[in-house]
Amino acid sequence: MTEDARDLYLDLMKKVLTNLIYRDAPIQTFVYDGEPDADPRLLGRDWPSVAHTMVGLKRLDNLQYCVETVLADGVPGDLVETGVWRGGSSIFMRAVLRAHGDTARRVWVADSFEGMPEVGADSHAVDREMRLHEHNGVLAVPLEQVRANFERYGLLDDQVRFLPGWFKDTLPGAPTGRLAVIRLDGDLYESTTDALENLMPRLSPGGFVIIDDYAIDACRDAVHDYRGRYGISDPISEIDGTGVFWRHTAASARSLQPATV
């Protein structure tokens, strides 16, 4: 695939995944202070009724940057997303691999496919306050539907692997091997912590961590608590007012490895 053809393909994929082409009606729209005129679909500020992703165009641009950078730099490892909704961001990662002719890396698609876990007395306090499970009528997307969405783009193949179940159950033993990009979209404190604890030690130096829900207090607290525990100081960069990312350094990678005796 020529460079021009690759750029056209990936640009069209982003517009189709976000449905910027036909502009389906939102189920719900979120307006942030200072953004009264912002386009919700560019910034991921709505829950679309039809589109295959709610992350918005800017976060897909960032995802493309991260995946293409690890490909160009030869950073070893697969790609993983935790919390995939209708699958759009994971589909896009597979599209980037296809566009660049990468036939070795896999895309790991981790989700309960049942929506958000119900909170209880033993759940984190901030998670209890949000009660996101009450929105599972929108947030729960069955595995069969996500697989079908991959298939619609011609991207369901052996390079796509699914990890169905709650993160605390599936991620510790997930057979991912090394990772180059980890994209976390679990919203909750506990979901974010489960993903960081289990996936960060597998992330290759030079790889990327993307936090979709950093604007949510519970998620942001989980990120800073985790980084504080392990002394991670890699600079955090903002994407669009909601998501952030950072590049994993060799020093941070060493801090996550068990001490040798």
Swiss-Prot record:
**Class of enzymatic activity (EC top level):** transferase
Q: List the disulfide bonds.
A: none
**Its annotated pathway?**
Antibiotic biosynthesis
UniProt-annotated binding residues for Mg(2+): D185, D212, D213
Q: Name the cofactor(s).
A: Mg(2+)
Residues binding S-adenosyl-L-methionine are 53-54, 81-85, 111-115, 167, 185-186, 191
Q: What does this protein do?
A: O-methyltransferase involved in the biosynthesis of the permethylated L-rhamnose moiety of elloramycin, an antitumor polyketide. Mediates the methylation of the hydroxy groups at the 4'-position after the sugar moiety has been attached to the aglycon.
Q: Which family does it belong to?
A: Belongs to the methyltransferase TylF/MycF family.
Q: What is this protein called?
A: 8-demethyl-8-(2,3-dimethoxy-alpha-L-rhamnosyl)-tetracenomycin-C 4'-O-methyltransferase
Q: Organism, per UniProt?
A: Streptomyces olivaceus
